[in-house]
UniProtKB/Swiss-Prot annotation:
Source organism per UniProt: Burkholderia ambifaria (strain MC40-6)
CDD domains: enolase
GO biological process: glycolytic process
Binding site for (2R)-2-phosphoglycerate: 163, 337, 366-367, 388
GO terms of molecular function: magnesium ion binding; phosphopyruvate hydratase activity
InterPro entries named among the record's database cross-references: Enolase, Enolase-like_C_sf, Enolase-like_N, Enolase_C, Enolase_CS, Enolase_N
Lineage of the organism: Bacteria, Pseudomonadati, Pseudomonadota, Betaproteobacteria, Burkholderiales
Pfam families for this protein: Enolase_C, Enolase_N
Catalytic activity: (2R)-2-phosphoglycerate = phosphoenolpyruvate + H2O
Protein name: Enolase
Length: 427
């Protein structure tokens, strides 16, 4: 038995300089697991609640000492002595202790930190790498990365309404080569921007954040960077967008301030379809407001056979909402953010539900990240096939890519890189 003998919660800082929760779990054998949780900027209204102190004179109200206190008192008392290898039972204990639908009492940030730290401690005691602990012998597929090389929206202080413009390397034989491709395109884009006298400062997720005149101009510039780096757009590298449409939906209209447009759901569907016809876009995330299910239906009917339509704010890693979406034929993919739901068991359930329905599951970071690389192990362990973890800069993003390199090396000859086949929802 891997008995839990000590639990320590603490307040640390994330990549934006805001407080977040870290937890250490110590087992009877002396092994320890440590985990830190991320935090989002554009958040879905139905996400599990991260507990903040609200004390205006300290970290602008964003402190997490209440969540840390819950770990060091109530949660510690409830799980002390439990078997760390019994993840589902431990997460069930946390859920029952919280007693709310949205984890608002203990805080999803407190619960997730404990859930992750327990899994890491159990993997360490079992002598297994975390991805293998999660997935067993069947875990051998590396994920295709969606690399956010231009930031807009809530992730940057610029004129772009769309939040993320991403490159997706698909023709490479290995993850290592895909990562190299992404890095080379990133540096080619930096040179192009610099030559134009445009900003090469980066946003929250490590992508550039210049003031482009339009989304078209941004996408065209990325195509130039792909070519400049020696790759073929549409063959070696595809494009992906995260619209984060809930952020610019006001008074029943999609208000693209940077383009001077106010569009209905049908008009915004046409707008996205035009972009998908003009550019090699394989994936669009949050193309409609999280509550605009009629708009989502229109978008899915229009583009669902040729473009991956990812629900982030729409589904918030919640099986109840995902089930409804599947039944109604809304979207064809779910974004998986561990802190949206608050425990590993619930996270894994959402991934499996998506797969059974023929939806893809894209494992994702948050804009406020830490050096914790658990999502890399989840992507491989659960054979998710896709990961979103930022650009090719900032160590809070690179830590996940480097962990995937280590995993690929550890797997050796049995490692596989799916490329275009990761988009099985488009077959």
């Amino acid at each position: 038995m891997s008995a839990i003998v000590d639990i320590i919660g603490r307040e640390i800082l994330d990549s934006r300089g805001n407080p977040t929760v870290e937890c250490d779990v110590l087992l009877e054998s002396g092994t320890m697991g440590r985990a830190a949780v991320p935090s989002g900027a554009s958040t879905g209204s139905r996400e599990a609640i991260e507990l903040r102190d609200g004390e205006a004179g300290r970290y602008n109200g964003k402190g997490v000492l209440k969540a840390v206190e819950h770990i060091n008192t109530e949660i510690s008392e409830a799980i002390m002595g439990l078997d760390a290898s019994e993840q589902a039972f431990l997460d069930k204990t946390l859920l029952e202790l919280d007693g709310t639908d949205n984890k608002s009492r203990l805080g999803a940030n407190a619960m997730l930190a404990v859930s992750m730290a327990v899994a890491k401690a159990a993997a360490e005691e079992a002598g297994l790498p975390l991805y293998r602990y999660f997935g067993g012998s069947g875990a051998m597929q590396l994920p295709v990365p969606m690399m956010n090389i231009v930031n807009g929206g809530a992730h940057a202080n610029n004129s772009l309404d769309i939040q993320e413009f991403m490159i997706v390397p698909v023709s490479q034989p290995t993850f290592r080569e895909a990562l190299r491709c992404g890095a080379e395109v990133f540096h080619a884009l930096k040179k192009i921007l610099s030559d134009r006298g445009m900003s090469t400062a980066v946003g929250d997720e490590g992508g550039f954040a210049p003031n482009f005149g339009s989304n078209d101009e941004c996408l065209s510039t990325i195509l130039q960077a792909i070519e400049k780096a020696g790759y073929r757009a549409g063959e070696d590298v595809l494009l992906a967008l995260d619209c984060a449409a809930s952020e610019f939906y006001h008074d029943g209209k999609y208000q693209l301030a940077g383009e001077g447009l106010q569009l209905s759901s049908a008009e915004f569907t046409d707008y996205l379809a035009t972009l998908a016809d003009k550019f090699p876009i394989v994936s669009i995330e949050d193309g409609m407001h999280e509550s605009d299910w009629e708009g989502w239906k229109l978008l899915t009917e229009r583009l669902g056979k040729k473009v991956q339509l990812v629900g982030d704010d729409l589904f918030v890693t919640n099986t109840r909402i995902l089930k409804e979406g599947i039944e109604k034929g809304i979207a064809n993919s779910i974004l998986i953010k561990i802190n949206q739901i608050g425990t590993l068991t619930e996270t894994f359930a959402a991934i499996e539900m998506a797969k059974r329905a023929g939806y893809t599951a894209v494992i994702s970071h948050r804009s406020g990240e830490t050096e914790d690389s658990t999502i890399a192990d989840i992507a491989v362990g659960l054979n998710a096939g896709q990961i979103k973890t930022g650009s090719l800069s900032r160590s809070d993003r690179i830590s996940k890519y480097n962990q995937l390199l280590r995993i690929e090396e550890d797997l050796g000859d049995i490692a596989s890189y799916p490329g275009k086949s990761a988009f099985y929802n488009l077959r």
